[in-house]
Curated annotation (Swiss-Prot):
Residue ranges of every copy of the HTH rpiR-type domain listed in the record: 5-81
A Pfam family hit: HTH_6
CDD domains, alphabetized: SIS_RpiR
Record feature DNA-binding region, as residue ranges: 41-60
Name of this protein: Uncharacterized HTH-type transcriptional regulator HI_0143
GO molecular function per UniProt: carbohydrate derivative binding; DNA binding; DNA-binding transcription factor activity
Residues annotated as domain SIS: 129-269
Alphabetical UniProt keywords: DNA-binding, Transcription, Transcription regulation
GO biological process: carbohydrate derivative metabolic process; regulation of DNA-templated transcription
Nucleotide-binding recorded as keyword: no
Gene3D superfamilies from the UniProt entry: Glucose-6-phosphate isomerase like protein, domain 1, Winged helix-like DNA-binding domain superfamily/Winged helix DNA-binding domain
Domain of life: Bacteria
Length: 288
């Protein structure tokens, strides 16, 4: 069953993997969630012009036993949201907005996407990923486009606390590195959409060579998750014009920073010493 209070976010994370008829149902629910809590199965099916069996299958696809359980959980979520549905609309940038208003809207957008990420994350899987990373001989982060930039940022942070880590955004380098991984290594694939062919193929190669594989994505059932041992789902709550800079990067960085914090937790002294050691060699090169 989907996490309580998380029905709408779960639908969003599964959206790209849904069939055409399921997307039709999802669109209506995301647009008018109150419809489900106020109507019966037959009434909703008639409104959507789909069969009752199709609606029940949709509920099972997103993790519920049937329509009744789905309706109950969605009703609970709506009752506790306190009109939070308005928050996404309030982050849209309008032509009349001044710089302060835009700044406040971006602040709200960041808060929205982090809240959604916390709701979507399977924290047990996250903790397992941290355990695997602590034991890993090497860690490789793979991602193209903006996800590649995020991978480089994570590489920098992990290297500073003593991990053997690398990152790549070039597909040829990604494939070659993945082919050389072993069962002692961990491969992390970053793809917000989940449909990056290069990243999905890299994770497949890494898996075939025995590495532990992790996918960080917004799309729970997507190509990048197919060969992943662990799937970490990030949020995507953003306005139409906010794009990757707010939605994708903030959500991905939030998850990676959470992993970093858990890796350091309980080993603060060792992490601090290692970080200072790596910092010192950088400071030595600065112009005095």
């Amino acid at each position: 069953m989907a996490k309580s209070g998380n029905v709408l976010n779960k639908i969003g994370s599964l959206y790209q993997s849904l069939t055409k008829s399921e997307k039709k149902i999802a669109d209506t629910i995301l647009r008018s969630p109150d419809l489900v809590s106020q109507c019966s199965l037959s009434e909703i099916a008639k409104h959507l012009q789909v069969g009752e069996a199709t609606l029940v299958r949709f509920c099972r696809t997103i993790g519920f036993k049937g329509f009744s359980e789905f309706k109950l959980e969605l009703s609970i979520e709506l009752a506790t949201k306190d009109n939070q549905d308005e928050s996404i609309l309030e982050t849209e940038i309008m032509p009349s907005d001044d710089s302060l208003t835009i700044a406040q809207k971006l602040q709200t957008a960041v808060a929205n996407v982090m809240e959604e990420t916390i709701n979507l994350l399977d924290l047990k899987q996250l903790e397992e990923v941290v355990k695997v990373l602590k034991k890993a001989r090497r860690i490789f982060l793979f991602g193209v486009g903006s996800s590649g930039v995020t991978a480089e940022d994570a590489k920098n942070k992990l290297m500073r606390i003593g991990f053997q880590v690398d990152a790549s955004g070039n597909n040829h380098f990604m494939y070659m590195q993945a082919a050389l991984l072993t069962s002692s290594d961990v491969a992390i694939g970053l793809s917000h959409s989940g449909y990056s062919a290069e990243t999905a193929h890299t994770i497949k190669i890494a898996k075939q060579n025995g590495a532990t594989t992790v996918a960080l994505t917004h799309s729970l059932r997507s190509p990048v998750t197919e060969y992943a041992d662990y799937v970490l789902v990030n949020g995507n709550k953003q306005g139409k014009l906010q794009g990757d800079s707010i939605g994708t990067k903030i959500a991905q960085l939030f998850v990676l920073d959470l992993i970093y914090a858990l890796l350091v937790q309980g080993e603060e002294d060792i992490a601090a010493q290692t970080k200072q050691k790596t910092l010192n060699v950088i400071l030595e090169q600065r112009i005095k």
